[in-house]
Amino acid sequence: MGVIAVNENDVKLVKSGHGQTKWLVPSKNGASPEMMIRHWGPDTNIPVHSHPYHEMFYVLEGEIEINGVAYTAGACIYIEKDTPYGPTRAPKGGKVLRYAEAGPSK
């Protein structure tokens, strides 16, 4: 795949399961890592779940809550694969950079 470079301003914001997403580096059927910017509104309420891959969130704006703990801009959250977490909320809205490694069942 080589080198991929993208500017956030060149990527469309699309509606996704919970909020809106800018897919900076989309995964190819789970065979490659992915990076995205997620925009979550105050109505975001993602139930407890887990993934068969590691993931990280970096809070860019606003505030998000995971497992009842609030994280504000500048916070980096690492979640190991197969770790149940949630609910995930953004009571005042939030914008996060999300990285997920390549893994099964994405």
Language-model features: where?
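A short, N-terminal "cap"/entry segment at the start of jelly-roll beta-barrel domains
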Residues: 1-32
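Conserved short histidine dyad/triad with adjacent acidic residue
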Residues: 19-21, 31-51, 70-73, 80-84
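Aromatic/pi-system hotspot detector in well-structured domains
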Residues: 60, 75-76
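Ligand-binding loop in jelly-roll beta-barrel domains
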Residues: 70, 81-106
